[in-house]
Amino acid sequence: MGKLYVVPTPVGNLEDMTFRAVKVLKEVDLILAEDTRTSGILLKHFEIKNAMQSHHKFNEPKTVESVVNRIKAGETVALISDAGTPGISDPGFLVVRECVRNGIEVQCLPGATAFVPALVASGLPNEKFCFEGFLPQKKGRQTRLKALAEERRTMVFYESPHRLLKTLTQFAEYFGMERQATVSREISKLHEETVRGSLAELIEHFTATEPRGEIVIVLAGIDD
């Protein structure tokens, strides 16, 4: 029986790719990629020429069985996403779950995940935190925000730039204008930036300055 490797890839800076990740990707029989065009650029940069197959949230339910069967037949497979660690607000959970259910060894390499540097650089308490990823866009959004209103731990969210102001405004409504937070964008890239302050200050800043790039919001928990 083969093995499934879960391989993190850089969230921006290609120099964050690990030696081990390159080695694994060069040795496996098949690479499952969220977007073969995006991953193709990464693989070409590191001279990785192994077979690649599209594996994203729209086809994952249909392709999991065939992937599991290939691993059972002895192939080694690597799972990568466009950026960061697969399964963290990215496709990957289903294939990992099915491999575990079928007794297949799953090995996840340590590596890049956008929320970790954002959390550490925020200056907010990080001994205990909760990762929320992307909030629901419609159904369940208000319910989730109400549930988080009494959360004491630091909270971490992903958001797109065009929805940032809407989300910050909703946070102010549910958590209060003076709640401390940070917005990190373009992590590990040339224009990386972290803006810190109260929700009121962040709303003012991003009303005047259009946000760009992938966003991580770190929000302080409620005071005791």
Each predicted region: which residue ranges?
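Loop/turn-to-beta-strand initiation segments
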Residues: 3-4, 73-78, 154
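Class I SAM-dependent methyltransferase SAM-binding "motif I" and its flanking Rossmann-like core
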Residues: 94-151
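Short active-site oxyanion
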Residues: 25-31, 103-107, 154-155
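Conserved helicase motor
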Residues: 54-61, 134-136
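A contiguous loop/helix-start segment that scaffolds small-molecule binding in enzyme catalytic cores
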Residues: 154, 158-224
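Glycine/small-residue-rich loop that forms an oxyanion/phosphate-binding "nest" at active or ligand-binding sites
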Residues: 56, 64-113
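Glycine-rich, flexible N-terminal cofactor/catalytic loop recognition
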Residues: 1-57
